[in-house]
């Protein structure tokens, strides 16, 4: 299984390069047309099972109707028996794939930040505690529900960099992953943030007791 984003796209190239036989790749979201054309020619060593629609639909009605289509239901069922699920973790900044591809506007991002969003997983925006930011976008998003992520096997999150620290922290706090792949500096920064959050909570509890 693969989620939307640049990092899953690069992983697809990596796997296709090193696989002796074709691999089956199942998309979890719509919008794959935005990044699959950028993959290398060796991607054809993969059997692609794609959800053939945009990531964000024009209305919730269209999204719900598309989910009833046999082809999309078949892909959704395949995803439940896949061995691995690879997802990117997006930050809330103008370099995010979802905004570089003009799916969301800078104004959309400003609004999400005002609502407390620090990142996204499978294009669901979440706050620092891993809770869903419920917006109109949610009703038009072709992506598994956050509550369904636990149904997938071996969910691997791949992300790194200073602009992803809060997003990674939020995803880990929400317990959406089985495995996180990142670099040492990012891992250290996420641990520092965790310790900082715990220290703040401890001081508040001590103050309350006094």
Task: Please name every model-derived segment.
Residues 3, 26, 30-33:
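Flexible loop/hinge segments that line or gate small-molecule binding clefts
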Residues 17-18, 31-200, 208-210:
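Conserved phosphate- and dinucleotide-binding cores of soluble alpha/beta proteins
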Residues 16-25:
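A short alpha->loop->secondary-structure connector
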Residues 4-7, 23, 182:
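N-terminal phosphate-binding or glycine-rich loops at protein starts, especially the Walker A/P-loop
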Residues 1-17:
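Helix-turn-helix/homeodomain-like alpha-helical modules used for DNA recognition
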């Amino acid at each position: 299984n693969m989620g939307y984003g640049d990092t899953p796209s690069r992983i697809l190239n990596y796997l296709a390069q090193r696989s002796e036989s074709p691999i089956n790749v199942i998309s979890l979201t719509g919008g794959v047309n935005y990044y699959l054309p950028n993959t290398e020619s060796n991607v054809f060593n993969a059997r692609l099972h794609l959800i053939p629609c945009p990531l964000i639909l024009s209305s919730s009605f269209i999204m719900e109707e598309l989910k009833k289509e046999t082809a999309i239901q078949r892909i959704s069922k395949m995803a439940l028996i896949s061995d691995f699920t690879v997802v990117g973790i997006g930050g809330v900044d103008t370099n995010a794939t979802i905004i570089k591809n003009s799916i969301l506007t800078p104004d959309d991002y400003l609004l999400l930040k005002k609502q407390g969003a620090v990142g996204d997983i499978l294009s669901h925006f979440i706050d620092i505690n891993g809770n869903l930011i419920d917006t109109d976008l949610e009703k038009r998003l072709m992506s598994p529900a956050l509550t369904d992520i636990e149904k997938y096997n071996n969910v691997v999150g791949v992300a790194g960099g200073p602009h992803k620290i809060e997003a990674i922290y939020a995803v880990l706090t929400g317990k959406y992953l089985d495995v996180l792949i990142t670099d040492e500096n990012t891992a250290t920064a996420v641990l520092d943030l965790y310790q900082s959050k715990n220290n703040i909570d401890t001081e508040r509890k001590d103050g309350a007791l006094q």
